[in-house]
From Swiss-Prot:
Record's catalysed reaction(s): a 1,2-diacyl-sn-glycero-3-phospho-L-serine + H(+) = a 1,2-diacyl-sn-glycero-3-phosphoethanolamine + CO2
Gene: psd
Active site feature: S194
Role, per record: Catalyzes the formation of phosphatidylethanolamine (PtdEtn) from phosphatidylserine (PtdSer).
Keyword match Lyase: yes
Cofactor note: Binds 1 pyruvoyl group covalently per subunit.
Cofactor needs: pyruvate
Biochemical pathway: Phospholipid metabolism; phosphatidylethanolamine biosynthesis; phosphatidylethanolamine from CDP-diacylglycerol: step 2/2
Descriptive protein name: Phosphatidylserine decarboxylase proenzyme
PTMs per UniProt: Is synthesized initially as an inactive proenzyme. Formation of the active enzyme involves a self-maturation process in which the active site pyruvoyl group is generated from an internal serine residue via an autocatalytic post-translational modification. Two non-identical subunits are generated from the proenzyme in this reaction, and the pyruvate is formed at the N-terminus of the alpha chain, which is derived from the carboxyl end of the proenzyme.
């Protein structure tokens, strides 16, 4: 029997992404200043500081460890699933439409991004753009974005794209071309509220449906080693 012991630290003391400490320090300093000026203002200041800590949380994930599994690189809601043409800058091989899974992250979701599958980083492409609402389909082509193409073996590739949104104005990618990565490995962050698109290899079927909640590094989006058909969802 395999067992996971859940401790209180798992929920009350999550790790903080390094990107967050600067913002947490600023919020805390402003809160202290407000307390010196008008003591009642410490309450909204504390609320915002705690929210900042919550936003930049970086909890440990239990990553499904089996060859062929593709996990979601972002926490949030599966917004769109369908066959589309990937952005031209990806130059995927073979060219043509692919199944795209779009995950939208609200300001309340964990914004630490993870690699959806193990492989080698073949290409990283940054594209400047607009900051329209990330829930719109056109955001994948119009918005500022950072794209990563992974070689995943057997002459296959997979791409995922960090997309800025209406509020999100900062994309961070810690990967470099030629780097080997593991499934679920931390690769970056987007602040504050945004979207992440995953382009599956040809023939792969999505195993999630629009409206489904997902957890970065844990929720399985596809199984490249299985012939299971695409899953559909029903709202109940």
């Amino acid at each position: 029997m395999r067992r996971f012991d859940i401790g209180w630290k798992t929920y009350l003391l999550p790790e903080i992404h390094p990107e967050g400490w600067r913002f947490i320090s600023i919020f805390a300093a402003v809160t202290f200043g407000l307390w010196l000026w008008q003591d009642w203002l410490v309450v909204p200041g504390l609320v915002l500081t705690i929210w900042c800590v919550y936003f930049f949380r970086n909890p440990k994930r239990t990553v499904p460890d089996r060859l062929g599994l593709v996990v979601t690189p972002a926490s949030g809601i599966v917004q769109m699933v369908g066959l589309v043409d990937p952005p031209a800058e990806l130059a995927l091989d073979p060219p043509g439409p692919r199944q795209r899974i779009s995950v939208f992250m609200s300001v309340f979701d964990c914004h630490v991004n993870r690699c959806p599958v193990g492989g080698t980083v073949r290409k990283i492409v940054y594209a400047p753009g607009k900051f329209v609402n990330a829930t719109l389909d056109k955001a994948s082509a119009d918005n500022e974005r950072n794209s990563v193409v992974l070689d995943i073996g057997q002459s296959r590739d997979l791409a995922f794209v960090q997309i800025a949104g209406l509020v999100a104005r900062r994309i961070r990618c810690d990967l470099v071309e030629g780097q080997s990565v593991l499934t679920g490995e931390i690769m970056g962050l987007i602040r504050f509220g945004s979207r992440l698109d995953i382009y599956l290899p040809p023939g792969a079927a999505p195993l999630v449906a629009p409206g489904q909640s997902c957890i970065s590094g844990e929720t399985v989006l596809a199984d490249l080693a299985s012939a299971e058909p695409e899953r559909l969802g029903v709202l109940r």
